[in-house]
Amino acid sequence: MKKNNFGKNFAESIYSSSSKKNSQKFSLDETASPLGLRRQDIFQSSEKVSQIRLVFYYITAFAIFAIFCLRLIHLQVIKGEDFSLKSENNRVKIDNLYAPRGEIKDRNGTVLARNDAVYRLVKENESRLVSVETGQKLIEQNEAFLDKEGPLGRLFEDTIRVYPKGEAFAHILGYTGEITADDLGNDSNSYLTGDRIGKMGVEQSFENLLKGKHGKKLYEVDSTRMEERIIGVEDPKIGGSLELTIDAELQIKLFEELKKEIEKAKVTSGSAVAQDPKTGEILAMVSYPSFDNNIFSNRIEGDAFSDLVNNPDNPLFNRAISGIYPPGSVYKIVSSLVGLESGKITPETRFVDEGEIFLGPFKFTNWFWTQYGRKEEGELDVSRAIARSNDIFFYRLGMAVGEKELQLGSREYGLGEKTGIVLNGENAGLVPDEEWKLRVKNEPWYPGNTLQMAIGQSDLLVTPLQVANFTSASAIDGILHRPKIARFVSFSDGRVEEIDLASEIRKVNARPEWLALVREGLKQACLTGGTGYPFFNFKIPVGCKTGTAEFAETEETHAWFTVFAPFDAPSITLTVLVERGGEGSAVAAPVARNTLEWYFSSIR
């Protein structure tokens, strides 16, 4: 029994000893942390960290979910209407329907500017015109071009400007060109990308009447963006149809005659204006050289435009209203009336031509004596002086009247100011005076300047239109008109409005007897013994004046001729200028003679 107890006790003793050792070991481990922490504290700390991380994960997940929900609410509730509209816009489309410009016609209904059908190829914010042939080929390749925007864009029906009468009308009609940002200004709502607007001439001056009002088409498209259903259409409205004062046949005839004489004289340029002296209406206005304004109807190629701009003869320049030249002897119409108005000469005044006069050391001669060796023409009154274009008479007139009277009188007859024609680019010309000469040339006004001005020289500069205008005033009761270029505009709704109303600028201060005296001189100028020899034996009486104007320091001269007819009841004034043409009677007068002979013929 003791043995068994010993074994038991020994085992218990061993176990007890082992337990104590383990207990001691555990106790040592719990106190063995280098930080002085017990293992139990470490386990508890680790559990806390895990809990914090878990909470962070929960919060992060919740935040992400909350953001997602808020975004969903924003898109569906707040922005839902916008997206709905965008979706609708992707389904509903608006096309612009291009409105054609109004036609331009002459006073007899002849079409001078019309519209021919073309297509406009539009892609995004760009557009260009293509011919009907090109458009039809595209449609043949894919009919959807008219109902759907493809890789090349979409085709719309449009028109292109056509000028059927050629270069005779280029300066007066002008042309159209693609609109620019500068052109738009504050009127951007009236135009579309690629629109063409007037850039010159009547096309530019009457842009607001000629341009149409674009329409719109609202329609639905299917998933392939093919037109499915038309919702509504606002039809485009064509622009107003403009009737000009121009006589197309006269315009063409005058251009042909001017061109013929310019080529015959072997010079390069000139212009002519025909006017109704009773109303101021312009019947014809030509400038040479000219250009084909049809080339501007589509995008002009760089080389073609460069050729026009760099041409030394400047075919784009409208010489009738923008060119300024010394008037030479055609100005004697004005200086005669100014002299009579001043009282320094009268219908009874006679000056003796002895071939030359002296002003100090300076000699002034009569052109006839200088040119033909004749020394004198004897005694002349104002009518005979006009008929003979006698320089000596007008030198003496200038000495009697003085520069201030000539300057004031010139302005009274519309010189030195624009006539007011509604075409852009008109030049006012120049009536020189003391202040101008001192400022520009740094010279005083000399007495010789007055003599030169009296015969249309010195620094006096005029346009052909101004000469036509004062010729008309001398022909009809001294009334100076603002030239009129257009008469009526007709709209698609049937309305017809009178436009560009001609108005009197003023009635010049000339008594009827003075005007009669000057007109008598103009009548004699076209009869035997006068200077307008191409009109000798003309079938109807006319009044005319020649001019041969010196310029620069060369011996070249500009050729002038101005005439009104019939003499007793004038219905037309015609003024012709041939630059560097020589004598007015030799070069410019034949243009007028041939044109008026045709104009008054029974064939027309």
Language model features by range: what are they?
Residues 1-302, 324, 344, 349-352, ...:
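Periplasmic/cell-envelope proteins involved in peptidoglycan metabolism and beta-lactam response
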Residues 5-6, 34-35, 113, 221-233, ...:
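Beta-lactam-recognizing serine transpeptidase/beta-lactamase-like catalytic domain environment
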